[in-house]
A protein has these predicted regions:
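N-terminal "arm"/small-domain region of PLP-dependent enzymes with the aminotransferase-like
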Residues: 1-37, 41
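Residues that form or flank phosphate/diphosphate-binding pockets in enzymes
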Residues: 23, 41, 99, 123, ...
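Active-site phosphate-binding strand-loop segment of PLP-dependent enzymes
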Residues: 119-199
Length: 199
């Protein structure tokens, strides 16, 4: 079969391997048998552990990084969270996963794309700085493929122009900038354990 031929190659890289073991299967079965599959003590424990391990004030578990991006985007319109209004401009990288952009659009923001640095595929600071305008209210960063932009410069720019910063750290779990975990610089961040993300 073609599958056997692929595995006979000297180098075979499957799309994904199992990212769970026996303990995780037993834990999942325990939750299912007890009919406690959402918002149970295991969820709270996971959120607390995640926040503690990654230096965040708190964590909220959702089903995916895309859902987290959507939740963050809509939360930006809350006065006590971001205070952005429909039509406000958010700067975002031109290279990213579509749900990061569409979450902002669905929340009613005007997205202005920023070029990326070809060496890192992350937001170009020079283009970011050039595109800050009078309608700009936020910067949506993506830490692509475990890389991160110069957070010192980004945060200084944000302070200078009173911009909210949000981070998509789905592909950068465990990455740090000057010993600070990415995802802890801005107002909120998304993370993910999806098998193709860089951990």
């Amino acid at each position: 079969s073609s599958r056997k031929n692929l595995q006979d190659r000297e180098f075979f890289y499957p799309l994904a391997l199992a990212t769970y073991g026996v303990d995780e299967v037993i834990g999942a079965l325990d939750s299912m048998i007890s009919f406690r599959t959402t918002m149970w003590s295991k969820t709270s424990q996971f959120e607390d552990n995640f926040a503690a391990n990654f230096g965040a004030a708190e964590a909220v578990m959702v089903n995916s990084g895309s859902s987290a991006d959507l939740l963050i985007a809509f939360s930006l319109r809350e006065k006590e969270f971001g205070g952005l209004e429909i039509g406000d401009e958010v700067l975002a990288p031109a290279v990213t996963w579509p749900t990061q952009i569409w979450s902002l659009v669905m929340a009613g923001f005007s997205v202005r794309l920023v070029d990326v640095d070809p060496a890192t595929m992350n937001i170009s600071f020079e283009d970011l700085e050039a595109k800050v305008g009078p309608r700009t209210r936020a910067i949506s960063l993506v830490h692509l493929m475990g890389n991160t932009p110069d957070m010192d410069r980004v945060m200084e720019l944000a302070r200078k122009h009173s911009l909210v910063v949000i981070e998509d750290a789905c592909e950068a779990l465990g990455t740090k900038w000057r010993d600070q975990p990415v995802g802890t610089f801005g107002l909120a961040a998304s993370s993910s354990f999806f098998f193709s993300h860089h951990i």
